[in-house]
């Protein structure tokens, strides 16, 4: 039963006298319900993390764009991945930071679904780009003689565009379907972002087919890309172990190690969050998992790539004027 007498900010009852549905003007992102001093601490912590994430990924994207020696397919993919990370973290964190200092913590109906759309679309584009990067590594190590003829600049650009386009089309239909569903009061989403799991709890009518559709799409994009990456690196590992030179094996492992570390970091948190849709997870744990994937993963990705890659470190030193920081 929907509480007809409950008055909640942002809800307008339908004119029909016996209707229990409501038009939602806005949602309330509850976030972390804690004392004001802790809210200030979290705001400072996440603001610093956000600034470091933007700086790190921005530095890598800028350096790869400036240094013509790094205008190769591998670094073009990496530069686009860093650029994607900037937009991905910016799709949710700024609003989250505002809510830490706000008493109302509201977000408009359109704003909520736009945040949902960009958060999932950019995340899907990242998954696809990680898969393309694994394919690039496979060609470079397993098919070195054919690599220059296959992975041309033209194909590289096409693959990047394909990742962006497919990423933004993948969750378009679910977003439209969810936005058309009727809601009942209250309009409080017990989360830090507009996530589909807590949002489904506000529906007046159960929609298991739409939920199954959303989770199926999430599972397909996660497991499909993950299995392709595992398959690519299985072939890469077989080729590397067959190399007669220890120097060649070490170089190949160092090249693939950074990408594998990023893949492990991204997919481990993704599988926990969206393959098992909140079953057995407390609300607080779901918030922490989302924060980890939305903020911590983009923060560490540039560190992983820059610390393991001599070419990127050299380019950063050149751009920053041979600083001792790097």
UniProtKB/Swiss-Prot annotation:
UniProt xrefs under CDD domains: 7tmA_OR11G-like
GO terms, molecular function: G protein-coupled receptor activity; olfactory receptor activity
Compartments reported by the entry: Cell membrane
Glycosylation sites: 13, 18, 106
PROSITE patterns from the UniProt entry: G_PROTEIN_RECEP_F1_2
The keyword Cell division is assigned to this record: no
Pfam families linked: 7tm_4
Positions in the Extracellular compartment: 1-44, 94-112, 180-216, 281-287
Membrane topology listed for this record: Multi-pass membrane protein
Name of the protein this chain belongs to: Olfactory receptor 11H12
Organism: Homo sapiens (Human)
Organismal lineage: Eukaryota, Metazoa, Chordata, Craniata, Vertebrata
């Amino acid at each position: 039963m929907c509480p007809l007498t409950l008055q909640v900010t942002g809800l307008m009852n339908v004119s029909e006298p016996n209707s229990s549905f409501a038009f939602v003007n806005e949602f309330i992102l509850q976030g972390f319900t804690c004392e004001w001093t802790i809210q200030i601490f979290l705001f400072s912590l996440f603001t610093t993390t956000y600034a470091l994430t933007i700086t790190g990924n921005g530095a890598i994207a800028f350096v790869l764009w400036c240094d013509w020696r790094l205008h190769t397919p591998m670094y073009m993919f990496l530069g686009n991945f860093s650029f994607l990370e900037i937009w991905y973290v910016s799709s949710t964190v700024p609003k989250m930071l505002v809510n830490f200092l706000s008493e109302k913590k509201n977000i408009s109906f359109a704003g909520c679904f736009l945040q949902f759309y960009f958060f999932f679309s950019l995340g899907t584009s990242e998954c696809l780009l990680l898969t393309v990067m694994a394919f690039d590594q496979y060609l470079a190590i397993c098919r070195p003689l054919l690599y220059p003829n296959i992975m041309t600049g033209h194909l590289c650009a096409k693959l990047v565009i394909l990742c962006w386009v497919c990423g933004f089309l993948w969750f378009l239909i679910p977003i439209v379907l969810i936005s058309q569903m009727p809601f009942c009061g209250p309009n409080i989403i017990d989360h830090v972002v507009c996530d589909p799991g807590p949002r489904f709890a506000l529906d007046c009518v159960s929609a298991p087919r739409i939920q199954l559709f959303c989770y199926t799409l999430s599972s397909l994009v996660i497991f499909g890309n993950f299995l392709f990456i595992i398959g690519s690196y299985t072939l890469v590992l077989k080729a590397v172990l067959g190399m007669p030179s220890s120097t060649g094996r070490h170089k190949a492992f160092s090249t693939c190690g950074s990408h594998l570390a990023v893949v492990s970091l991204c997919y481990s948190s993704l599988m926990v969050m969206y393959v098992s849709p909140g079953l057995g997870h407390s609300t607080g744990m779901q918030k922490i998992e989302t924060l980890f994937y939305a903020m911590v993963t983009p923060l560490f990705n540039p560190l992983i790539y820059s610390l393991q890659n001599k070419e990127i470190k050299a380019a950063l030193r050149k751009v920053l004027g041979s600083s001792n920081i790097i």
